[in-house]
């Protein structure tokens, strides 16, 4: 075994955590040559359930899984980690305002940011999954000033996968034939799934799909509202598909991107495409396996700019609501 990675997962006994841990342990995230240690963080009352998950992980006898531990002590869970997968957050409840949700989770992610800075390995990278993930990542990052800003990501990969599937189904092709799908902005109902730069079998999606009214209307709204549609159908939020997107996102970060393609995740803005510096904003990204860069130079037309500005403004509003938590 040539490499080993220590991974912290918060909210490990929850539905996303349950769907995620076995895939990390099997090697799907970091590849067949990388051993894994899992350090799980859970609330005290969820420790028994997390121990049950560990029993199942043991019973899988994964060759790549060297060790699993669970703790309600954040310093223990984050000690010497190379990756922090921040899955756990407080979900929005009936009657709760967005500002309330931001502040409740803000306290959690303030603590987690400080603990990452204090305990993690010097090469730590962080993917925030718990919603509202862009602003949760912003809060954690600003409370861990010693961790470089290019190590922080929030997940828009589920939106990318949803968009790819919608385009593939409309075009009558396989999802593997769809590439270059960018999700701009916030992981929320304001996100902008960009079909103008997307490709189907290497051709512009707008050439392959002639129904441009669908692209500008139902395509965007379906992707934006897919999470709510799943809750309505299933009675619970996306879990397996979210876990799958976590695997995809980390794999895309640590693996060289196919030439000419990109993947979507939110990261720290340095002003690219006119976005406020310091926001955690959804961009198209490419990786050389070590360093991740924002794909620049893409055209955003007047239609796209209108959508782009809506999601940009929402993220600025969220930042303003939590400004007292930004270190």
From Swiss-Prot:
InterPro entries: L-lactate/malate_DH (IPR001557), Lactate/malate_DH_C (IPR022383), Lactate/malate_DH_N (IPR001236), Lactate_DH/Glyco_Ohase_4_C (IPR015955), Malate_DH_type2 (IPR010945), NAD(P)-bd_dom_sf (IPR036291). It is an enzyme of class 1 (oxidoreductase). Its EC number is 1.1.1.37. Keywords: NAD, Oxidoreductase, Tricarboxylic acid cycle. It catalyses: (S)-malate + NAD(+) = oxaloacetate + NADH + H(+). Substrate binds at residues 92, 98, 131, 162. NCBIfam families: MalateDH-SF1 (TIGR01759), PRK05442.1 (NF003916). This is Malate dehydrogenase. It comes from Leptospira biflexa serovar Patoc (strain Patoc 1 / ATCC 23582 / Paris).
